[in-house]
Amino acid sequence: LEGVRVLDLTRLLPGPFASLVLADLGAAVDKLEDPFPGDYLRQMPPSVDGQGSAWQALNRDKRSLVIDLKSPEGVETLRRIVPRYDVLIEGFRPGVLDRLGVGHAALRALHPGLIVCAITGYGQDGPLAKRAGHDINYLARAGVLGVTGPADQPPAVSGAQMADVAGLDAQRVQLGNGLAAAV
């Protein structure tokens, strides 16, 4: 993917992992973060040199950009830099970028050739679309979270994203076939 430029607006695991794969394949990836706290994985232990080791692993070979998308200046900066990129990956709940004035249609108006990838917990529409979705949410909905620790203590959060990984295998187990996905 040499010559392909990617702008990553995601946090935690799914988006940073997707952009890491693109970086490993040769794309130039710029990761955009809020001024503070940035990607929450930065603060998650274990850490090395004050940075979460998971964050370091998922964001190696990426250039960091700090832009406050909650400010008009930050949104204007995003509008200005979008034409430099071939791909934009975002992990906001549906409608968030629209409220900021930089939804998918607005981004494509700025750059008609832009590929926009939206990563959400529950899709772009439907009854759960506006909810945040993370591994812990999926474990709770599946009834698994209650067995991750002693009954008299809060659930133990797994170091690995069990629900995310289990979801990869669900179709094969249920239907007896694999899945081909093209990005």
Language-model segments: residues:
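N-terminal helix-loop segment corresponding to the beta1-alpha1 unit
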Residues: 1-183
